[in-house]
């Protein structure tokens, strides 16, 4: 589902399953806009968030409440590049019966398939690496399509009849695609964060060279890390490729 920006993709993904009185568990290492949406804006609408350090797997488990609707995070935290233990966090979410929503902007699908690591829903800011040329803004939501939304009364926006579409139940009508269809039918309609045609064209053009650009980003980064690590004027270097980084393994 293409959106006007990465933030609109994140907002739609959360508001599709969250209502006033609900709760989110989120990594504390997030893009600033994401952090403030969770910390300052959503509480005005009755949606609260508990933040957990991305390496604290047990902390994610302890933070889950009966009204928790999802776990949100970034695999590679922005800006501290702490790595979230997504496979373990995903197991915790599965045991709790809630989806894991991951912002995949930093790694792009070229470098990492987040679904293989346990994500249920992925959001991207296409503005950055995916488009690649600083010409257009955009975002997207990608649903894996195998989450069970029919868990009693846990997800009423998925299971209960929706008056906005003649009493339709999205889980019954669309099955594995229920989340995407609800986000499209309600969120896109009511909030209007549609991607413009020109931005869509520019982003698709940019994605054609994604593999070439990401390979170059990685090789350039390796050169920079090596240079800085061996420079006597540099006190410390923080990068997961270094053996002494806490998330190197």
Q: What are the roles of these predicted feature ranges?
A:
Residues 1-230, 238:
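Conserved PLP-enzyme active-site core in the AAT-like
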Residues 233:
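Hard-cation-handling environments
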């Amino acid at each position: 589902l293409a959106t006007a920006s990465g933030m609109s993709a994140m907002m739609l993904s959360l508001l599709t399953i969250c209502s006033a009185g609900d709760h989110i568990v989120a990594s504390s290492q997030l893009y600033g806009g994401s952090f403030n949406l969770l910390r300052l804006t959503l509480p005005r609408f009755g949606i609260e968030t508990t933040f957990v350090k991305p390496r604290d797997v047990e902390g994610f488990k302890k933070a889950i409440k009966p009204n928790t609707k999802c776990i949100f995070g970034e695999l590679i935290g922005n800006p501290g590049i702490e790595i979230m233990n997504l496979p373990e966090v995903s197991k915790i979410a599965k045991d709790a019966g809630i989806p894991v929503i991951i912002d995949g902007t930093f790694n792009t699908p070229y470098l990492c398939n987040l679904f293989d690591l346990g994500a249920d829903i992925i959001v991207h800011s296409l503005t950055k690496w995916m488009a690649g040329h600083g010409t257009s803004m955009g975002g997207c939501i990608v649903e894996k399509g195998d989450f069970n939304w029919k868990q009693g009364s846990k997800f009423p926006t998925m299971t209960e009849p929706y008056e906005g579409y003649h009493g339709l139940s999205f889980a019954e009508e669309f099955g594995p695609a229920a989340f995407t269809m609800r986000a499209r039918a309600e969120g896109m309609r009511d909030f209007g964060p549609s991607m413009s045609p020109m931005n869509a064209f520019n982003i698709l053009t940019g994605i054609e060279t994604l593999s070439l650009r990401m390979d170059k980003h990685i090789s350039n980064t390796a050169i920079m890390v090596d240079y800085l690590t061996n420079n006597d004027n540099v006190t410390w270097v923080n990068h997961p490729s270094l053996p002494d980084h806490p998330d190197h393994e």
